[in-house]
């Protein structure tokens, strides 16, 4: 398979739903700090925006470094660049709905900073190489060569509580559009719930 990170081969293996995200809805985001690409420490449980969108991804490509062996054959491994770019491309629409976007991986800070600058990401990536955040939520991982990576998952939290989980995420380049659609539906449901009884008949 080609290793152009912006392209998804048509024969990528589809990840299965092994139930590794079933325990998350209703859980609080853990109050742990992780290093962000702007050099700050971020505590996702303290985010003040109405919604927090956290896409958890295995790892993005590093210039001049080959991906782990058989990376494309691991279900759900390939596609982190298209996924990240999909969130970049609808970032304004997500922000308009009150969502703050973050990406999280086990990659080191320097690799995330390089990737963020190269792809012009308008949101922060969070580095969790010791899996402190991941262990607090019991996020699923897999191993490739000597790398421990998170399985791809997207978490939508409202006021610090996980409201929705997308797992497995496939295809990854459609993730942001699916999140956007879910948030639009949530906004419509909120508007309907706040409408006075009989208001639709006026």
Place the predicted regions along the sequence by residue.
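Chalcogenol-based redox active-site neighborhoods
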Residues: 1-202
